[in-house]
A protein has these predicted regions:
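Membrane-embedded beta-strand positions of outer-membrane beta-barrel proteins
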Residues: 1-2, 55-57, 92, 106, ...
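Signature of Gram-negative outer-membrane beta-barrel scaffolds
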Residues: 1-99
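Outer-membrane beta-barrel translocator domains and adjoining extracellular loop/strand segments
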Residues: 2-18, 65-74, 116-125, 167-175, ...
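Transmembrane beta-strands of outer-membrane beta-barrel pores
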Residues: 4-6, 59-65, 108-114, 121, ...
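Extracellular loop and loop/strand-boundary signature of outer-membrane beta-barrel proteins
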Residues: 23-30, 69-81, 124-131, 176-181, ...
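Hydrophobic, lipid-facing positions within transmembrane beta-strands of outer-membrane proteins
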Residues: 35-43, 88-92, 128, 138-142, ...
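Gram-negative outer-membrane beta-barrel transporters
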Residues: 49, 53, 161-163, 180-271
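Membrane-embedded beta-barrel scaffold of Gram-negative outer-membrane proteins
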Residues: 97, 103-111, 131-190, 195-197, ...
Length: 284
């Protein structure tokens, strides 16, 4: 159990000048403050030598304040935005030890991300979101953790399902890159990590994931996403391979060499409702 408190203050100055030889026609500033406090706790119940249940909870409350303004001929109109919200998140997990080297587990948890301001230049077109709201998710996971008796080989593997509500997305609206909310989404997949240590000093690891993440509902038309669209920047396949070898140089000195290889499948970029209309393209 415990508690935390954090406060983040951000100040973003800027100038607007059409010609270096002319005086500034606007001095612009954006001030943002984020304040949060939270209390949390976890408890584990041992139901015999092989079976454990762990429960956890966290309550947090955050406040945000955004102030944008400036001076000069083309200074933006004053903008003030305040938000305040509290949220309770939780988790529950069960683990069963098949043996001293093999364990099965399941886990379900609720997550949360606070909203915030979009830092934009002055006089943006109407309909450009100045702020974005919080989002939340519930994740479900089941997996296995196992290793050989001599620890020369180990593997972690899990399948997962995630349900999002009001998912935060990076998008382009009126030619400005910003954060917006996109309704409901889901993600299903599988991930694994395998590690091989055949000899002293030599380690080979391979990890990968398959993820199918899509919108469940249409977004706001300004965002440009439709139900069934893949989530941005989420490759379907992701594989990483790493190899390291270390050896002694005598005394306390060691040397090592290593190499890594990463492969990703293609992925969608951010949503942009105006891209197709601008270039005469149809949606796939």
């Amino acid at each position: 159990k415990g508690g935390i408190f954090q406060r983040i203050d951000l100040f973003e100055p800027g100038t607007l000048n059409v010609d270096p030889l002319l005086p500034n026609i606007a001095d612009i500033f954006t001030t943002s403050t984020y304040e949060e406090y939270a209390a949390f706790g976890n408890a584990t119940v041992h139901l015999g030598p092989r079976f454990d249940i762990t429960l956890g909870g966290r309550y947090s409350h955050n406040k945000q304040f955004v102030d944008q303004g400036g001076t000069g001929l083309l200074a933006p109109p004053a903008l003030e935005s305040r938000s305040s919200e509290g949220v309770f998140t939780w988790s529950g997990a069960a683990k069963y030890k098949v043996s001293s080297n093999v364990a099965l587990y399941t886990r379900v948890a609720k997550g949360f991300r606070p909203g915030g301001p979009n830092l934009l230049p002055p006089n943006v077109p109407a309909g450009t979101p100045q702020t974005y709201s919080s989002d939340s998710l519930i994740s479900y996971e089941a997996g296995i953790k196992a290793e050989t008796a001599d620890r020369s080989f180990s593997i972690d593997a899990a399948a997962f399902h995630i349900d999002w509500t009001d998912i935060q997305l990076f998008t382009v609206i009126n030619n400005f890159g910003l954060n917006a909310n996109g309704g409901k989404a889901k993600s299903d997949g599988f991930e694994f990590t395998a590690t091989l240590r055949p000899t002293r000093g030599f380690v080979f690891s391979l990890n990968g994931a398959y993820t199918k993440a899509r919108l469940k509902t249409d977004t706001d038309p300004n965002v440009g996403g439709l139900s069934g669209d893949p989530l941005p920047f989420t490759p379907k396949f992701n594989v990483n391979a790493n190899v390291d070898y270390s050896w002694s140089l005598g005394g306390d000195s060691e040397a090592f060499v290593g190499a890594s290889l990463r492969s990703l499948s293609k992925q969608r970029a951010n949503f942009d409702a105006g891209f197709g209309a601008l270039y005469g393209l149809d949606r796939p």
